[in-house]
Amino acid sequence: MIKGIAITTVWVLDQDRAKDFYTEKLGLEVRTDMTMGGEQGMRWLTVGAESQPDVELTLMVPGPPGLDPESAEAMKKLVSKGVLGAGVLSTDDIHRDYETLKAKGVDFLQEPRERPYGTEAILRDDSGNWFSLTQRNEQLDLDKAWGECVDPM
């Protein structure tokens, strides 16, 4: 039986730049950084939050062995265009983290806004992927207006 989510892929344009962004700006830690299949093989690079040792993001450049050249090129265009939302990053103090990340040069598409589920800001990584940075409420408040939603494009 499935026990949880362990690894998910975030498509990036440059693994070294992505590694710097996710570790130096977002504060995640490198879990794995190795080449599989010899010197010309595929680089397997994962990062994760110290508080979640069982959950990792694989920072992958679109290409073989998983994608043929045409699909890889299409994926790179989608990533750089900012079409792909990569997920939700959780925080216990969104205003503190928003200011800290902004000071580190993280690109925010939306400043913190109240939502029925909590407060969220939308950020973009150095490849174009966007994430919701969210501080969740104890309970869902369906009476609260959603407010204006940002278009990541």
Predicted regions and their residues:
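Core segments of cupin and vicinal oxygen chelate
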Residues: 11-62
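N-terminal beta-strand motif that seeds the catalytic metal site of vicinal oxygen chelate
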Residues: 1-19, 32, 84-89, 137-153
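Residue-level detector of high-confidence beta-strand sites
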Residues: 31-33, 111, 133
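Short glycine-/small-residue motifs
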Residues: 56-57, 130-133
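Active-site/binding-pocket entry motifs
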Residues: 53, 63-67, 139
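Active-site beta-strand termini and strand-to-loop segments that position acidic
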Residues: 48-52, 123-126, 136
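A short acidic/small-residue loop/turn micro-motif
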Residues: 38, 116, 136-140
